[in-house]
Amino acid sequence: MRAIGMVLAGGSNPRMRELSNQRAVAAMPVAGSYRGIDFTLSNMSNSHIQKVAVLTQYNARSLNEHLNSSKWWDFGRKQGGLYIFTPTITAENSSWYRGTADSIYQNLGWLKRSHEPYVVIASGDAVYKMDYNKVLEYHIEKKADITVVCKDMPAGTDVSRFGVVKTDEDGRILDFEEKPVDDYDACTISCGIYVVRRRQLIELIEKCAQEERYDFVRDILIRYKHLKRIYAYRHDEYWNSISTAEAYYQTNMDFLNDDIRKYFFRTYPDVYSKVLDLPPAKYNPGADVRNSLVASGCIINGVVENSLLFKKVFVGNNCVIKNSIILNEVYIGDNTYIENCIVESRGTIRANSRYVGEDGIKIVVEKNERYVL
């Protein structure tokens, strides 16, 4: 392909509540066996982008561990590959990434050494499938300076975590409002995916750095919306961000829908992830599992309904789990009741416990001793 990829995966996110205390949002487990960043990296690979940089910063240990081998996404190649860039102290720079534009600026040498004419920039915290070639073709057809992938959202959508765009009949963006406070009827939002010519990106980023501007949306898209040809490419398939705890919960629950599972996992192209060699889930006598997604390595002795169990979860005798997400390596003691919850990974839920999210999603973080002698 004629483009390189950049995945923005470094920001902290307090809207994820306790879930972001241990990992970056891009490393959040999704759909039983995947991580948030797997969907963007798979899209890059399936679009034949052979050189991809992941820009990390906040709580990056789990994400770096997940990306320790590039072979899972077919980036293990002599030409190109997968690059992990964290902020480093140099003679010219002594700070962390101060924003999305600054994260690109601090890795500008990689952009300058590349020879591909275009750059695809995407966030690592969205779940979707996309052929970036189609976006690039649209970008060239419109003779755009920047193309923003957008999605039409129905009335009632919480747009406070998105950028809302307004376009003319030809698709050119006329206005861009980042994370508006006011409610909207049906509107068009930015998906945080951009296509731009590499040389122009270098020029824009260098200008931002000279003026001490650090944010890609505010200091490039909004600032130049009337000066540059910025176009919207509409994505009509499934797309959802996992940038809040509530959105993360709903996105995972969407995978209990058979049509969505078929779209992601039984329809070409595939979604790739790091593979752990674990045994299949074991259902002991007394297990009752209904409309749930259970990952490998789990042992089930109780009732699981409308829930997702990630890898190596143990469910004790007489347990009931409803409408919940249990992350990796959680031990749930006997006679426990869990409903409308997200249970943090590597936790131990003591026997006879009860956790219910009554006014919303409850996040359970229990690090009890697993074995008492």
Residue ranges and their predicted role:
Residues 1-255, 364-365:
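Unchanged
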Residues 1-4, 199, 207-373:
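Left-handed beta-helix
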